[in-house]
Amino acid sequence: MSDDPKAPYLAAAVFYQDPKAALTWLEEAFGFEPSMVIVDQSGELAHSQMRFGNSLLMVGTEWSERHKSAKSMGGINTQTVHVQLNEGIDAHCERARRAGAEILQEPETQFYGDRTYRALDPEGHIWTFGQTIEEMDPAEWEKTMGLTTRKRL
């Protein structure tokens, strides 16, 4: 995100059956930093925000039929959150594993120069983490993989 508070940005929101537990777990497992927690009169979580670098993640409770945890949907994910690290992806994966994440894909270097892993959180959300290991020009992976890279379809 920009230093300009009015600059446009993209944030993700994830929903949990137990968002309070999720906040604690996401901090422990992935290193996300809580930045705002709003509770209602009964002490239930109304809204929360976490930061990771310049990124914003909102963590909330299930609040409609269209805002559900993967756990409530039989483990179905319609999207994942990708988090790009600057360094330490293997250690990050081990941290997540120690916190109880199921590692769906061990750290592996991809054809485009990033090393990635995938993890499942306690309520079934899939998280992908990446770190650029080698800066590669698209022409390099096109040649190696037989792919075509362009800006638009």
Can you say where each PLM-predicted feature lies in the sequence?
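Vicinal oxygen chelate
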Residues: 1-13, 23-24, 30-120, 130-153
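C-terminal catalytic core of tyrosine-transesterase DNA break-rejoin enzymes
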Residues: 123
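Short acidic-aromatic low-complexity motifs
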Residues: 16-20
